[in-house]
Amino acid sequence: MSVGPATSRHADEEARAEVDVLNSRLEKTTQLTKKIQACMGRLESTGKSVREVAGPLSGETKKLQVLGNNIDSVLAAIERLRQPADSKNDEEQIIRAGPDKAGLSNYLASIKRLSKSLVDMQASNLRANQQTMAELVRLIKSGNSQLEGHFDRLLRGETPRSIEPLHYITKDMPFPVLSQDKVTRLGLVNSYITSNHRQNAGAATTPQDSAIAKIYAEIRGPYLSSTLANLAAASVNTTKKKNPDAIYRAGTNGIGTYAQAMEGMFLAEYDNICSIFTREDWGPLFQATCQSAMAELARTLRELNNHIKGHLDTDCYLAYEITEIMSGLSSNLETRTGELKSSLAAALRPVRETAKLSLGELLDETKRKIAAMQTLPQDGAPIPIVSATMQRLQTMVEFLRPISSIMFSLGDGGWRTNAAADGRSIDAIPSLASFDIGADGKEIFSHYCSDTVDMLMAGLDSKAKIVLKGGRAVIGVFLANSVVIIERMIRDSDLAPLLEGRMSMLDQWRKKATGMYTMDCKEVSTHLFDVIHTSKARPQSGQADSASILKGLSSRDKDNIKGKFQAFNASFDEMVSRHKTYNMEREVRQMFARDIQQMLEPLYNRFWDRYHEVDKGKGKHVKYDKSAIAAVFMTLY
């Protein structure tokens, strides 16, 4: 039992020993902490002293760094400023050599470097650089001038004085353009000079102010006009005809070939311009390049117009053809380029005005010709003005497209009032749509044709009443001949489908002519009328018994019947004789013969049936039996 207390004491002693050890360590730690705190205090004091000393040194160091950087920048700037001056001699050698020897790319790069150096020097504004800047300006101007000369030489080398346009037209070949190599070189030169020009001249500059653009127009413009000059002259020369009175036929003038060549040349030139210049340059430069050729076109059209006005009867159709050709040219060029429409309209205007005036002037001229006639054929023969007028209308059908356009601009019936001269016209060119011949276009033209025919017939009718001395019959023959010729020339030509709805205009004149011619026939027929007394028995129907009828007549009545036969014979023979002397168209002779036969034969046959026994077959009073007079009627056809 003694073991328990001993163990407990032993444990207590160990615990006290451990506590003593811990206390000893804690005391050492406390002493160490105090030492560290003392060191920290001393270190803080030392650091403060260091900061007080190092602060000013750090500020000075930073200032020195900034100063050093500034010095480096100044040295770099000076180096850059010295570089152009140092390289000027090298660039000057390239500039003096020119783009041909130095190579275009190398030459352009040299000028660009000089320009950049000049900009840098101008930005520095150092007085020491003024002389160098002046030398750079001189070199740049010299370089630009040589580039312009290079452009000029390249373009002239590729531009012949002229080409033969018919070679390309007849072989259906495209007109030549500049070679791709030259286009590339010309484009490089233009790109640099135009950019430089606009930078120096400011925003107010226009494309045509560019020296390169002026050079291009000055070289290519004469090339265009020289190439087209012969065709322009040919257009004027082909107006001369062996027979001055011959009517103009479509396509016989050179204006169509001239316009075709102009279109091909202009479009090829526009392609050149688009390949070399920037978009804003295309339109103005194209206008400037074509200016000389357009002036020649305007002069040519004025000469053609003067010729047309002097030969309006025969050559008005040329005005219609020119109107259509030039309108097509304008439309094609506008579609491809958007240019020259107003210039072409101004050039075409004199011819188009003449074309408008011609429609009314032709009617007036026909009236004047009829009024000036002093005589007409006394046999009723047709006169040339009828066929000439219809031939004019036939020819107009060949130019129906431009004529329809012109008539639209005048308005239906506008040719009567010379609407073309009322000041409404402007420098406008008709579009291709206006040349589309629809129902309205054909209707207006047919209206013009009917006006022409009506005016012609009215004029001939009035003149015939004054001039023809052979009475109503010859006037009827004259009018009927005219009607038949008009009808025939309509029926046998392209006028037929256009005027099929207006042929009634001729029916009234045919009816009038027939009425005038058959007036004499009616007078002849009066001798075949007898008087039936109502107090006597009505004649039996059917075949009359001439002997029985005559038995019922008094001697006086028989003498009257004999007189009627004799009067009929005389007037009938005279009418037949006159009929055979008249100069009639075949259709007219048949028409009038038929009218005479239908009017007289039934009356004569009736009269003969009733009274032929009046001279008892001796033929003294009754000259014709029914078969004999029928034979006479047949000779009238």
Protein language model regions, located:
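Long alpha-helical rod scaffolds of large eukaryotic non-enzymatic complex subunits
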Residues: M1-Y637
